[in-house]
Amino acid sequence: MSKSNASAEISGLQICIVNTDAQIDAALDSGDRRAFRVWCLRRASLIARVERVLVEAATAKAA
């Protein structure tokens, strides 16, 4: 994966994480435990994807 592709993907994922954080806040404000759990799982998934992109970029750079 090229550096620019990785950077673009991470930027997109950051936007998704920020939007997910807003959904988590909304779920907390409304007391919706189910929505809170769903959005927290989504956020964890997005963060894991960022980690995978970083590892792929570092591996490609080392090769």
Model-derived regions, located:
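Short, charged, low-complexity loops and linkers
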Residues: 1-5
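Short, charge-rich amphipathic interface segments used for partner binding and complex assembly
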Residues: 11-63
